[in-house]
């Protein structure tokens, strides 16, 4: 009976640790995304291809659902001339899955320290102007059915102008900025 009690205690501790680390309630607060401070680094700025920058935090469980969607975006749009980049949350450690190995890393993107949450995406048009900044979608999950990104990329690919750099959204996001204590 003592062994059963010890086993139950160990199982409870493991469950409690797992729940605290990996299970989170759905975030129902509104995130306000503003692209005003964002600038591409000089080597990528200016006229050129459509550029999509993926902002991610390896410790954020919200990235898992969106990485499959991002893989599909790369498969669909890289052949159409869209270039894909990633910016990892400063001070974090991790790597994207192998399915996203085609994303080029941007170590420092001016203004990225001011973004509110991740996962997030910024898209620059062929003229080098920021066309979109915000989340991939609203809600708990992200896929091509509820994504904001496919319509933006389609419009830009067709030469249409897009100006959606300020977005309010409710979804699964993790804070980007360092906690101030």
Give a label for each model feature.
Residues 1-37:
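N-terminal targeting signals for export/organelle localization
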Residues 47-48, 79-82, 116-119:
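Extracytoplasmic
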Residues 64-112:
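Structural microenvironment flanking redox-active thiols in thiol-disulfide oxidoreductases
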Residues 58, 89-91, 126-128, 135, ...:
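Solvent-exposed coil/turn segments that connect beta secondary-structure elements
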Residues 131, 136-181:
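Thiol-/selenol-based redox modules, centered on thioredoxin-like
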Residues 43-64, 69-70, 84, 153:
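Short active-site neighborhood of thiol/selenol oxidoreductases, capturing the structured segment around
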Residues 27-44, 72-79, 174, 181:
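Intrinsically disordered, low-complexity terminal tails/loops enriched in metal-binding residues
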Residues 97-135:
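Short, internal strand/loop/helix patches
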